[in-house]
Regions:
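Two-component/phosphorelay signaling modules centered on CheY-like receiver
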Residues: 11-28
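Acidic, metal-coordinating helix/loop segments flanking the phosphotransfer/catalytic sites
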Residues: 28-47, 68
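Active-site T/S-Asp motif of two-component receiver
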Residues: 49-51
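Receiver (REC) domain active-site loop signature in two-component systems and cognate sites
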Residues: 54
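C-terminal output helix
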Residues: 103-114
């Protein structure tokens, strides 16, 4: 079963994401530091789904740190803020995909399926 790490500092969003991705094995983290610790404990991690704006570091900073250990880690980044999603410039170049929050469950599941395949 594919393993996904979901990172978001909003507990209601974290719960929504974990539920929506229930067909996969899901680990959750409430902040980037917890995500780094959780990722170290997972031997086979297929995807990270992470918020972009979080208190201790941004999503692209988290991704850079995770990719130091897992260079081929696939990423789906989420943002709930009024950010223009410019795929030509950072931070979006560090990810394989991005979605704006709020998103439909089908959009989330579709993006995940494209990145890592069906469970």
């Amino acid at each position: 079963m594919k393993h996904i790490l979901v990172v978001d500092d909003d507990s209601s969003v974290l719960k929504f994401l974990a539920h929506a991705l229930g067909d996969y094995r899901v680990s959750v983290a409430r902040d980037p530091d917890e995500a780094l610790n959780v990722a170290r404990s997972i031997s086979s991690l297929d995807l990270i789904v992470t918020d972009y704006l979080m208190p201790s570091m941004t999503g692209d900073e988290l991704i850079a740190r995770l990719r130091e250990q897992r260079p081929s880690l696939k990423v789906l980044i989420l943002t709930g803020h009024s950010v223009i999603l410019d795929v030509e410039n950072p931070p979006w170049w560090v990810t394989e995909a991005h979605l704006a929050k709020p998103m439909e469950i089908e959009a989330l599941r579709g993006a995940v399926a494209q990145l890592i395949g069906l469970p």
